């Protein structure tokens, strides 16, 4: 399973990338706005830090605008993936970008029928928002299972990128239900390392190590 960071904070990306555990990065306009820097400047720097996919979202909601922005974004680096919202104009854009062999990430997916449409359009990635689905009292994990079954039934190559991951349980369940990859904020990524028994065990080892001669 591939693990992505959902952030535009360069320092956070550098930290996790230094462990050799991050496969890519996802961004959105809200995350980049927090940086106070220009959109393209941030994407270019992120692409220089990680070699894997970096999702950069178009700002327009119209086909012509999305295409113009997408073609500019892919010039930044070879690992840029064009992120588009799951709306009719967005999927029309995905169809055209797919014809040009430009990778895409369809975002804001909240239902299996939406995911089916994205796959038919040729999306490289589909991003179901697990945490936000849970917030509406629906089951975000069931959504992953439904998408996985549909894609397997019909042989779609679109990769399931579980998004809106809030912590280790979301990641574990996404992995068990067949998501190909997952993206999460820096804080959630750091939670993956932690377990109280690990801390207790390490404390005991360190205490015992004081009795040893190196």
Curated annotation (Swiss-Prot):
Pfam families, per the entry: TAL_FSA
Catalytic residue list: 83 (schiff-base intermediate with substrate)
TM spans (from-to): none
Top-level class of the enzyme under EC nomenclature: transferase
Enzyme Commission identifier(s): 2.2.1.2
Tagged with keyword RNA-binding: no
Pathway recorded for this protein: Carbohydrate degradation; pentose phosphate pathway; D-glyceraldehyde 3-phosphate and beta-D-fructose 6-phosphate from D-ribose 5-phosphate and D-xylulose 5-phosphate (non-oxidative stage): step 2/3
InterPro entries recorded: Aldolase_TIM (IPR013785), TAL/FSA (IPR001585), Transaldolase_3B (IPR022999), Transaldolase_3B/F6P_aldolase (IPR004731), Transaldolase_AS (IPR018225), TSA/FSA_arc/bac (IPR033919)
Signal peptide (UniProt feature, chain positions): none
Alphabetically ordered keywords of this record: Cytoplasm, Pentose shunt, Schiff base, Transferase
PROSITE patterns: TRANSALDOLASE_1
Catalytic activity: D-sedoheptulose 7-phosphate + D-glyceraldehyde 3-phosphate = D-erythrose 4-phosphate + beta-D-fructose 6-phosphate
Hydrolase found in the keyword field: no
Gene Ontology biological-process annotations: carbohydrate metabolic process; pentose-phosphate shunt
Localization terms from the record: Cytoplasm
GO molecular function, one term: transaldolase activity
GO cellular component: cytoplasm
Function recorded in the entry: Transaldolase is important for the balance of metabolites in the pentose-phosphate pathway.
HAMAP family named among the record's database cross-references: Transaldolase_3b
Family: Belongs to the transaldolase family. Type 3B subfamily.
Protein name (database record): Probable transaldolase
């Amino acid at each position: 399973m591939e693990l992505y960071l959902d952030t535009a904070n360069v320092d956070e990306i550098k930290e996790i990338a230094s462990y050799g555990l991050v496969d890519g990065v996802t961004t959105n306009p809200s995350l980049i706005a927090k940086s106070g820097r220009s959109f393209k400047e941030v994407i270019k720097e992120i692409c220089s830090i990680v070699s894997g996919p970096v999702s950069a979202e178009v700002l327009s909601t119209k086909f012509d605008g999305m295409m113009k922005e997408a073609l500019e974004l892919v010039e930044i680096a070879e690992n840029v993936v064009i992120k588009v919202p799951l709306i009719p104009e967005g999927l029309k854009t995905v169809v055209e970008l797919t014809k040009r062999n430009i990778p895409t990430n369809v975002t804001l997916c909240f239902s299996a029928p939406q995911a089916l449409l994205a796959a038919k359009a040729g999306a490289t990635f589909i991003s179901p928002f697990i945490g936000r689905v849970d917030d509406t009292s629906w089951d975000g994990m069931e959504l992953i299972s439904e998408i996985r079954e549909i894609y397997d039934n019909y042989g779609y190559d679109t990769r399931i990128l579980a998004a809106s991951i809030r912590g280790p349980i979301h990641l574990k369940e996404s992995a068990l239900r067949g998501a190909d990859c997952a993206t999460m904020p820096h804080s959630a990524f750091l939670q993956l390392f932690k377990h109280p028994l690990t801390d207790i065990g390490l404390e005991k080892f360190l205490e015992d190590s004081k009795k040893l001669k190196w």
